[in-house]
Amino acid sequence: MFAHTAFRQRCARWLFATGLFLMLGACVEKPSTLERVKEDGVLRVITRNSPATYFQDRNGETGFEYELVKRFADDLGVKLQIETADNLDELFDQLGKPSGPVLAAAGLVSSERRGAQARFSHPYLEVTPQVIYRNGRSRPTNAKGLVGKKIMVLKGSSHADQLAELKKQNPGLEYEESDAVEVVDLLRMVDEGQIDLTLVDSNELAMNQVYFPNVRVAFDLGDTRDQRWAVAAGDDNSLLNEINEFLDKSQKNGTLQRLKDRYYGHVDVLGYVGAYTFAQHLQQRLPKYEKHFKATSKVEQVDWRLLAAIGYQESMWQPEVTSKTGVRGLMMLTQRTAQAMGVSNRLDPKQSIQGGAKYFMVVKDQLDDSIKEPDRTWFALAAYNVGSGHLEDARTLAKREGLNPNKWLDVKKMLPRLSQKQWYSKTKYGYARGGEPVHFVANIRRYYDILTWVTQPQLEGQVAEGNLHVPGVNKDKPAEQSPQM
């Protein structure tokens, strides 16, 4: 009897201990999404591969979305791991997997279709959906004009949702959703006449239109919309709250505006003629001098594509050009600058490139140490064009106006004032055609963007071999004569 009682007591104690252990285990909270990210030390992000979001060039990863999400990862104190999706359905499917990425940063617009899959952040970029057609073809001016047209959009996109709504009022409207294309492909198909129309957001068109000079905006479809990041619908609020706090802070401290200026502040500087001409020269002229740009790049430690962009802005890659003011050669050097840089023959393209690169680096090295990249490069370009003294005057004006004298976004607003007496009379170096360096920098940035895109590793060598397809250039059409400078 005693033994039986003791056995029952031991069992009771064992059951009590087991129950207590299970209860305590249940009380241990599961780490939040944000805590898991910090514990792992990695922020896994999924995006799209395009000029407006994310791509890789010779210097590594770049793109508007990449730059912004990299800053977020840095704020968290973790590494950034980028994954790309072939289409939007795959992107949202991967986002919802327990072992998948925790954040989607891909120029997304919130929609009812995605409501069950994701929750969206505060906005960070305002865009306008636009109907795109090919120049020379019938231009629709409203939704009714879409009926009877061959239209393709990204599968699962907000643009597909828009067309679905329009179809309710316009039953004859037909369109195709494709998961085998990206925005660049859709614009190319319009440019080449494979489809009549597509829908893209204004920022994507701005980044890509220079590659497709025949595409035009038919009309804006609806109001402006906000692009947002997304997290999985089933996740807790921890990461989303941190994202919103970061985006709000980035809006207030100017980070978002600086990124917008860096990627979109100069994209509209090329019109149709400029885009078409540059596309031609990219194939016909650049291959002759690319080796000189690359060789000089190694010596002076400056990106060869930036040197090429400067050269194009200066002479359109024409080595024997001479201006009315006496500057000559591919990099348009003055006699004085050429002598200082050791250039004996300004019409020799190799010497001209070497001299121009050396001078650019001299100017850049003379800038105040407080000016950091990427602004330092834009400041150096402005000084290369207008002179360091006038640039310093513009920085002084910026400071007087309560702006940041170390940010190109602010200083470029002041440069045009150097041509106005009420302003230049108060400066050390006086009058300057201050608008010129603003355009000079904007043009070079645009050329540089294009060169960066077309010289991605997967396209390497195609420019030099003449095999690179530059949209808008008909290879069977004789090259038009460029205007002499």
UniProtKB/Swiss-Prot annotation:
HAMAP family reported for this sequence: MltF
Region (Non-LT domain): 28-267
Active site, per annotation: E314
Assigned keywords, A-Z: Cell outer membrane, Cell wall biogenesis/degradation, Lyase, Membrane, Signal
PROSITE patterns: TRANSGLYCOSYLASE
Segments for region (Disordered): 465-485
InterPro entries, sorted: Lysozyme-like_dom_sf, MltF, Solute-binding_3/MltF_N, Transglyc_AS, Transglycosylase_SLT_dom_1
SUPFAM superfamilies xref list: Lysozyme-like, Periplasmic binding protein-like II
Span list, region LT domain: 268-485
Entry's free-text remark on domains: The N-terminal domain does not have lytic activity and probably modulates enzymatic activity. The C-terminal domain is the catalytic active domain.
GO cellular component terms listed in the entry, alphabetical order: cell outer membrane
Protein name (record): Membrane-bound lytic murein transglycosylase F
GO biological process: cell wall macromolecule catabolic process; cell wall organization; peptidoglycan catabolic process
Signal peptide boundaries: 1-27
NCBIfam families according to UniProt: PRK10859.1
Family: In the N-terminal section; belongs to the bacterial solute-binding protein 3 family.
PANTHER family with a match to the protein in the record: MEMBRANE-BOUND LYTIC MUREIN TRANSGLYCOSYLASE F
